[in-house]
């Protein structure tokens, strides 16, 4: 094991000079905090320089985009193991990518999170030591992977409904991976057309018994850019409103034979001598042993939800920044009548404009009594143009920029706190606490919903600018993608509401109490009339979403207040 570890370190140094340098600095460990800050600053400069070169020109198509990511992966600037060893670096890398690629659309940043978090992260979470070591070879070759979870029938219930099967044959000592119907087809698989490997979620069948969803590492091709392996079919989901530099595929498996080594079996596997299903790591605590593989995959979804929240937040920040820069230099104008006796001249100009519109509407047969064809010309004759304030100072737009900035600062602070707590959990390889899980859900819900709302309002106030390419508005459907990615926000809202109904929040504020009691009273009234609890929840969907939003905003306020209190305490202690 020691020799393998040293060999891996030597290969790492040869494949990534930057990483080798960093490892040596860690071994020395003499520079302390300031040394780490300098190292991180240097990494950021190198990473941003790499992004500048890769994103200098937009990708021609999804293959071009995939090649760019392959180059980034191969550079070694970000390792798969950074997800647990240095998770702050992963989150920063993603945020920088969203900022740098703002004008080019969201495809590349989505591709990035699939490669590192969903594909690589799942192998780190569920794979054995050999499988995790092989990730390094994947990185060195610049191979791309995908994460095949969502199925056609399941929709937003990904993981809860899995029909793809993987059946173990003790006689053959192999699995058979099968898509039993079109409804079981994997759909919307990002990077699915170009992936060399795929983490596929399928029901594990052993001796006729279904052991639930497990993860399998499937070779889609023998080598990067090579033809698909036999009995694997893929197709394009079709053109999208944005992000067409990202391939979204459907995938089918027609009795694909897999070796035992394809099963990610860190926690659960098969005794190949007897063919029995076995649970490993029996030394773990009771709570840890009872986790399913889907529970463990959920750890990746927590990381992904924070990344999605940050991506949506960064997108709308960049959109508002760029739009305000335009609005600050965009002049507006006022009318000043040329003579004091010109009272009503502006009304006259308006009448002329209306008359011309009427003439055009009826084919121009009726001539205006003002004998003119241009309302703009007449208006110029009647009045003089006076420079007004910039567009950004128009009252409604000025107010929108102010509101957006206030929300931005609050969400910035909250996302920093959530990322910090999640990174601590990832480093310690601990399960996320209930409080952290709720905070991650609140971040995903509110960062995305606020971005959608503010972007829509901004579009209404900026005229033709919002219709132009290269403004960012053309990619705003990315925010809709964020709403449904890594856990549908509506599902997260319903879970938050159900949890609040089931267990009262000990830090409950008055608005949350009122909303919770209103929902409970409605549910009870419906049940008293003979309605099932499921139907009652469907009927009270408005009250449920209202409670969820209030609860989510209360979580943001609570976390920010707690962070402020901790910061103040640290300042007092430092003075002492």
Regions from the language model: what does each represent?
Residues 10-146, 156, 170-176, 349-352, ...:
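Amphipathic, small/basic residue-rich leader segments at the start of a protein or domain
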Residues 122, 184-186, 484:
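Sensory/regulatory domains in signal-transduction proteins
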Residues 170, 174-233, 250:
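A short core secondary-structure module
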Residues 188-189, 226, 250-304, 322-351, ...:
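A glycine-rich, basic-preceded beta-loop-alpha segment at the flavin cofactor/substrate interface
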Residues 227-256:
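Flexible, small-/acidic-enriched active-site or ligand-binding loops
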Residues 342, 346-348, 355, 381-425, ...:
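Extended, well-ordered alpha-helical scaffold/bundle regions in very large, multi-domain proteins
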Residues 434-511:
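Alpha-helix capping/hinge segments and adjacent helical runs
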Residues 455, 473, 489-565:
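Ordered core of a single globular domain
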């Amino acid at each position: 094991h020691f020799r393998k570890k040293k060999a891996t370190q030597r290969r790492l140094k040869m494949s990534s000079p930057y990483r080798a340098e960093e490892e040596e600095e860690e071994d020395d460990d003499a520079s302390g905090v300031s040394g780490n800050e300098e190292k991180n600053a240097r990494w950021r400069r190198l990473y941003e320089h790499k992004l500048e070169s890769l994103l200098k020109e937009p990708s021609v198509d999804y293959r071009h985009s995939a090649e760019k990511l392959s180059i980034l992966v191969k550079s070694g600037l970000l390792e798969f193991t950074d997800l647990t060893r240095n998770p702050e670096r992963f989150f920063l890398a993603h945020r920088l990518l969203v900022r740098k690629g703002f004008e080019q659309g969201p495809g590349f940043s989505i591709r990035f999170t699939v490669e590192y978090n969903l594909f690589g992260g799942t192998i780190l979470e569920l794979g054995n030591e050999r499988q995790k070591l092989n990730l390094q070879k994947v990185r060195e070759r610049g191979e791309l992977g995908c994460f095949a979870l969502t199925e056609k029938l399941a929709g937003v219930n990904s993981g809860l409904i899995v029909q793809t099967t993987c059946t173990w044959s003790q006689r053959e000592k192999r699995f058979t991976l099968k898509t039993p119907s079109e409804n079981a087809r994997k759909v919307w698989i990002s990077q699915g057309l170009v992936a060399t490997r795929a983490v596929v979620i399928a029901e594990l069948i052993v001796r006729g018994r279904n052991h639930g969803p497990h993860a399998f590492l499937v070779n889609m091709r023998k080598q990067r850019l090579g033809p698909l392996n036999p009995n694997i079919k893929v197709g394009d989901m079709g053109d999208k409103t944005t992000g067409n530099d990202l391939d979204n595929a459907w995938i089918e498996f027609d009795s694909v034979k897999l070796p035992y080594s394809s099963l990610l079996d860190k926690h659960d596997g098969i005794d190949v001598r007897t063919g029995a299903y076995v649970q490993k790591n029996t030394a773990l605590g009771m709570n840890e042993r009872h986790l399913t593989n889907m529970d463990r995959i959920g750890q990746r979804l927590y990381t992904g939800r924070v990344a999605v929240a940050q991506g949506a937040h960064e997108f709308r920040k960049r959109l508002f920044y760029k739009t305000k820069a335009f609005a600050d230099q965009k002049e507006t104008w006022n009318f000043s009548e040329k003579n004091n006796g010109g009272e009503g001249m502006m009304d006259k100009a308006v009448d002329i404009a209306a008359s011309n519109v009427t003439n055009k509407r009826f084919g121009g047969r009726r001539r205006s009594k003002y004998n003119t064809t241009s309302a703009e010309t007449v208006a110029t004759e009647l009045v003089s143009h006076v420079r007004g304030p910039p567009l950004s100072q128009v009252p409604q737009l000025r107010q929108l920029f102010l509101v957006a900035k206030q929300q931005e600062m609050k969400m910035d602070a909250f996302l920093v706190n959530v990322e910090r707590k999640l990174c601590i959990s990832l480093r310690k390889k601990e399960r996320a606490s209930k409080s952290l899980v709720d905070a991650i859900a609140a971040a995903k819900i509110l960062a995305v919903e606020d971005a959608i709302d503010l972007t829509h309002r901004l579009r209404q106030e900026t005229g033709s600018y919002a219709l132009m390419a290269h403004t960012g508005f053309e990619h705003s459907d990315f925010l809709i993608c964020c709403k449904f990615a890594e856990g549908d926000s509506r599902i997260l809202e319903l879970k938050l509401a159900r949890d609040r109904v089931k267990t009262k929040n000990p830090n409950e504020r008055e608005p949350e109490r009122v909303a919770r009691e209103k929902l409970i009273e409605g549910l009870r009234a419906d049940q008293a009339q003979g309605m099932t609890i499921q139907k009652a929840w469907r009927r009270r969907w408005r009250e449920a979403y209202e409670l969820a939003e209030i609860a989510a905003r209360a979580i943001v306020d609570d976390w920010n207040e707690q962070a402020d209190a901790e910061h103040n305490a640290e300042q007092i202690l430092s003075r002492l």
